[in-house]
Curated annotation (Swiss-Prot):
FAD binds at residues 329-330, 343-347, 360-367, 381. This is Electron transfer flavoprotein subunit alpha. GO terms for molecular function: electron transfer activity; flavin adenine dinucleotide binding. GO terms for biological process: fatty acid beta-oxidation using acyl-CoA dehydrogenase. The keyword NAD does not apply. Belongs to the ETF alpha-subunit/FixB family. The gene is etfA. The keyword Electron transport applies. Participates in the electron transfer process during N,N-dimethylglycine (DMG) degradation to sarcosine. Keywords: Electron transport, FAD, Flavoprotein, Transport. Signal peptide: none annotated. Binds 1 FAD per dimer. Pfam families: ETF, ETF_alpha.
């Protein structure tokens, strides 16, 4: 009998159709479980209302709108599982899958974590020939949980030659990695933050034909590489399928981030020094940009105001001093205090900021949905029981005007001290 895996098209169709009466049954049979949320075709997160919440002690279902309770198991169970992830150590890998994350701001972005999840799939596909994920990180970084993101080996390159915008020097460093370990796959984010350009330069140097705009990778026994990838083409209007090449540039949400295992992230050292390259590019530093001109969907630091703000001049002054992009709740927009394009939430703009400060925002459900992807949320509010306080990673209870004035004073003093020291 053939050992090739057999696929049931009907079961796959039911698994994709969340309204089918046998949807959860088929998911359980396929080992996927029932999903509580998933990204929709336009990028918005969809939630299954039957999988949100938890059963209270009196048997009544409770729904926590702050986002701390997810799925049917509740937040405590999730936290317990996260604290006891099994540690996976691969002493002698059969091959390497190299990942070059963007590391914007010195930390892994959501795009980087998706890419590491894809690398983990490629490395763990064959238990008999286990691979390892090698992360090549340029410059200083602040990450302390690279192992939880799925990294088995870490190569940290931090030298003046590759600091800043230095694509030629960085490609030379990647060529050295290629000569030292010859990874089976090279994965880079297809982004405007450096990964897209670096991946194309690397492919040209190695003479490889890369795949760009990848959003899906599936196992394929008939493919020469064992994998089939689907990429965006024709300005995003066409899907192109081809065998997965050695160099792949993937989009965000190309795979699920690693969440169930921990890895060692053992540090490696290049066997030879980095080659000296004559760069034809001179990095003159970053160009200062007015935060007010940055679109909310692209902003990394947002200071949002709601109905609790009484002194709008103080709010605008704080946003200017902090260098934050201004946002607003629906109430503030409806009252005419902020323009419509500054509205945050499911009825406005979905934001993915690294830091989101909510000033005087109680936290309507549509607003909480819009800030769900934000990494750190800080709430300034007079009501300690509002939903935004429950959602926030850091909460400050008090008058927003006084708190913003004190914050502006501290930032101004710190800048003056730094200027005097220089």
């Amino acid at each position: 009998m053939s050992q090739l895996p057999r696929r049931d098209p009907r079961q796959e169709w039911i698994a994709r159709n969340r309204l089918h009466p046998r949807h959860e049954e088929v998911l359980a049979a396929l080992g996927q479980g029932a999903t509580s949320e998933w990204p929709g075709p336009n990028g918005l997160m969809r939630k299954n209302p039957h999988r949100v919440g938890f059963i209270g002690p009196n048997g009544i279902k409770r729904i926590d709108r702050s986002g701390t309770q997810q799925g049917a198991g509740g937040g405590k169970a999730s936290a317990s599982v996260a604290g006891h992830k099994p540690l996976t150590e691969i002493a002698e890998p059969a091959f390497l899958v190299a990942v070059v994350p963007d590391m914007t701001g010195g930390r892994l972005s959501g795009h980087d974590k998706d890419l590491l999840g894809l690398a983990r799939r490629l490395a763990d596909a064959d238990p008999a020939a286990q691979g390892a994920v090698l992360a090549v990180v340029f410059g200083s970084h602040k990450e302390t949980n690279l192992g939880e993101a799925g990294v088995d080996r870490l190569l940290h390159l931090d030298s003046p030659e590759i600091a800043g915008y230095a694509p030629e020097a960085r490609v030379g460093a990647l060529i050295t990695v290629e000569q030292a370990w010859t990874p089976r796959h090279w994965l880079l984010p297809d982004s405007k933050l450096g990964g897209g350009e670096l991946g194309r330069r690397l492919a040209a140097r190695l003479g490889e034909r890369p795949a760009t705009g990848i959003w899906q990778v599936e196992a394929d026994a008939e493919s020469a590489t064992g994998w089939q990838c689907t990429a965006r083409g024709a300005a995003g209007s066409l899907d192109i399928r081809r065998p997965l090449p050695r160099i792949a540039l993937a989009l965000a949400e190309c795979a699920e981030p690693v969440s169930e295992t921990r890895h060692t992230a053992a540090e490696l050292v290049l066997p030879q020094p980095l080659p000296s390259t004559l760069s034809r590019i001179q990095d003159l530093g970053q160009v200062s940009v007015d935060p007010a001109s940055v679109a909310l969907s692209e902003a990394e630091f947002i200071l949002a105001a709601g109905n609790g703000v009484r002194d709008w001049d103080a709010y605008h002054r704080a946003a200017s001093v902090l260098g934050a992009t201004e946002g607003a709740s629906r109430v503030a927009v409806d009252e005419g205090y902020m323009p419509r394009d500054r509205q945050v939430g499911a009825t406005g703009t979905w934001v993915t900021a690294r830091v989101y400060i909510a000033v005087g925002i109680s936290g309507a459900i549509q607003h909480l949905q819009g800030i769900q992807p934000c990494e750190k949320v800080i709430a300034i509010n007079m009501d300690p029981s509002c939903d935004m306080i429950k959602r926030a990673d850091l909460a400050v209870i008090g008058d927003s005007t006084q708190i913003l004035e004190a914050l502006v004073t501290l930032v101004s003093q710190a800048r003056e001290e730094k200027r005097d020291a220089a």
